[in-house]
A protein has these predicted regions:
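Soluble ligand-binding/transfer domains with enclosed cavities or grooves
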Residues: 1-160
Length: 160
């Protein structure tokens, strides 16, 4: 699978802003592994951040929820230790925005929960989001986060 560089992603982002992406929830479902990140305003991916997040096995997991909602989790792990945020997400607008709210955070070791806490809801106008840019049939997804950084994920192989 050929992944795009920063310049190609910026071109795709311009197109997404002008025309929308046509993406719907069904093409977003799955477990996505973070591959590259570009800091706000940069055309070069951050080598260190990408290396660190790949080393921490950073992932975004999207599943079908009730009605229009998606179930979302974001996790990092080192060996058997995992930190996972869980919540709900929904798509809004033509581009669209994937807005989400984390409800809980969990710390597990080898699948055993050591800590689980509820997370206070953010103010409505401060919800985190990903402005979706492109979902490629070859298995990658690009989006820009609320903080302005650009992220590229790769769809993980389906688990049996």
């Amino acid at each position: 699978m050929k992944r795009p560089d920063g310049a190609a992603l910026l071109e795709l982002e311009t197109t997404a802003r002008q025309r929308g992406t046509g993406l719907n929830a069904s093409v977003l479902l799955g477990r996505w592994r973070l591959r590259s990140v570009w800091p706000k305003g940069e055309i070069q991916a951050s080598s260190f951040s990408g290396w660190a997040l790949r080393g921490l096995q950073a992932e975004l997991d999207l599943r079908s929820g009730e009605e229009e909602q998606l179930l979302l989790s974001n996790a990092v792990s080192i060996g058997p230790l995992e930190l996972r945020f869980r919540g709900e997400a929904s798509l809004r607008g033509r581009r669209p925005l994937l807005t989400f709210v984390f409800k809980t955070v969990e710390l597990t070791v080898s699948g055993r929960c050591l800590l689980k806490r509820e997370i206070p809801a953010p103010m409505p106008n401060r919800k985190p989001f990903f402005a979706l840019i492109h979902r490629d049939p070859s298995g990658w997804l690009a989006a820009r986060g609320r903080g302005g950084g650009l992220a590229l994920w790769e769809l993980a192989p389906a688990e049996n």
